[in-house]
């Protein structure tokens, strides 16, 4: 029996010829990641182990992105702990303010995660890296601590669901819409502890930005990982960034899948996930009665250059509604710089949006755009649980960047078509 790409990567890193779903394995990891919320816990657990050094100072990434620039004393102390740990153990991939970006945009951009890698991160959206053809999954801080010491972690081999996307995308529909639509179909537990493998002609023609968005939100369906078999688009992205060898894996034709689902993308419009679950999905054009107070365009889901370009196409020559606050967050410094060079930042400021430095910020209700009681936001982020962006009685709607930008101009949820685009 053949294996899926997820099974092949796990088998290779466990030193086995094959693995089967449900099997418990111990495997060598390529990268261990933690941020300013999860790393302090991992560091404390690491110090308890009494080891003299980390397993590999070039295979650990510490990214203080959630509350950067540090929003208060506690956040500053947590970042100080990361900084001191990185200095003590000479961690190569520690990203200070000025170099820092949102971790799941930053690591691929820097060539730290590559195809065929086995990656664990003390952050649930570590699954983003599946877009590169890596098996990447979130773990707890204790597992991250052990891996920083040993370079290994335990895994339960997941079943895999294959998702096939075909047809022609409608205008203003992106990878964000496809993953929201998929989660709306299968539910927030529809892929619990499984790998979601995305394939089909639509995926074949999708840029890396859309692939990152889709794999990023696999966890919102309960998945252990989202993954896409690498192709020419992947290799074009990776070859400019890779500083070490990597290996391409694919799925065998006779691989066994838990389920196979197919979607005709020509029938999928721009969609919005309504409060308070990413699965509460409705067509954007059915929500024109929903007034909004805030727009957030950014995050590890949609803060890449292509996302900013999409938002700028909608905002160019227009103004944000006077009763709406629009916050735009480039995911990394390099993205910010390129957006400056392309004139995107000027478009945003002319539209009366505010541009933030790279940070997770409002996505997790941290800072830089917290909602008050009764307020509503439409955001390109990945979660809209109760209280996610602020007050428990606030609401968050999830969309792609074009819909978010159009909504900011209209003062209510709407689409670019309503602006004549």
From Swiss-Prot:
<dbReference type="InterPro" id="IPR011826">
    <property type="entry name" value="HAcnase/IPMdehydase_lsu_prok"/>
</dbReference>
<dbReference type="GO" id="GO:0003861">
    <property type="term" value="F:3-isopropylmalate dehydratase activity"/>
</dbReference>
<comment type="pathway">
    <text>Amino-acid biosynthesis; L-leucine biosynthesis; L-leucine from 3-methyl-2-oxobutanoate: step 2/4.</text>
</comment>
<dbReference type="GO" id="GO:0009098">
    <property type="term" value="P:L-leucine biosynthetic process"/>
</dbReference>
<dbReference type="InterPro" id="IPR015931">
    <property type="entry name" value="Acnase/IPM_dHydase_lsu_aba_1/3"/>
</dbReference>
<comment type="subunit">
    <text>Heterodimer of LeuC and LeuD.</text>
</comment>
<dbReference type="InterPro" id="IPR018136">
    <property type="entry name" value="Aconitase_4Fe-4S_BS"/>
</dbReference>
<keyword id="KW-0408">Iron</keyword>
<protein>
    <recommendedName>
        <fullName>3-isopropylmalate dehydratase large subunit</fullName>
        <ecNumber>4.2.1.33</ecNumber>
    </recommendedName>
</protein>
<keyword id="KW-0456">Lyase</keyword>
<dbReference type="InterPro" id="IPR001030">
    <property type="entry name" value="Acoase/IPM_deHydtase_lsu_aba"/>
</dbReference>
<dbReference type="Pfam" id="PF00330">
    <property type="entry name" value="Aconitase"/>
</dbReference>
<dbReference type="InterPro" id="IPR036008">
    <property type="entry name" value="Aconitase_4Fe-4S_dom"/>
</dbReference>
<keyword id="KW-0004">4Fe-4S</keyword>
<feature type="binding site">
    <location>
        <position position="360"/>
    </location>
    <ligand>
        <name>[4Fe-4S] cluster</name>
    </ligand>
</feature>
<comment type="function">
    <text>Catalyzes the isomerization between 2-isopropylmalate and 3-isopropylmalate, via the formation of 2-isopropylmaleate.</text>
</comment>
<dbReference type="InterPro" id="IPR033941">
    <property type="entry name" value="IPMI_cat"/>
</dbReference>
<dbReference type="InterPro" id="IPR050067">
    <property type="entry name" value="IPM_dehydratase_rel_enz"/>
</dbReference>
<dbReference type="InterPro" id="IPR011823">
    <property type="entry name" value="IsopropMal_deHydtase_lsu_bac"/>
</dbReference>
<dbReference type="InterPro" id="IPR006251">
    <property type="entry name" value="Homoacnase/IPMdehydase_lsu"/>
</dbReference>
<keyword id="KW-0411">Iron-sulfur</keyword>
<keyword id="KW-0100">Branched-chain amino acid biosynthesis</keyword>
<feature type="binding site">
    <location>
        <position position="363"/>
    </location>
    <ligand>
        <name>[4Fe-4S] cluster</name>
    </ligand>
</feature>
<feature type="binding site">
    <location>
        <position position="300"/>
    </location>
    <ligand>
        <name>[4Fe-4S] cluster</name>
    </ligand>
</feature>
<dbReference type="GO" id="GO:0051539">
    <property type="term" value="F:4 iron, 4 sulfur cluster binding"/>
</dbReference>
<keyword id="KW-0432">Leucine biosynthesis</keyword>
<keyword id="KW-0479">Metal-binding</keyword>
<comment type="similarity">
    <text>Belongs to the aconitase/IPM isomerase family. LeuC type 2 subfamily.</text>
</comment>
<keyword id="KW-0028">Amino-acid biosynthesis</keyword>
<dbReference type="GO" id="GO:0046872">
    <property type="term" value="F:metal ion binding"/>
</dbReference>
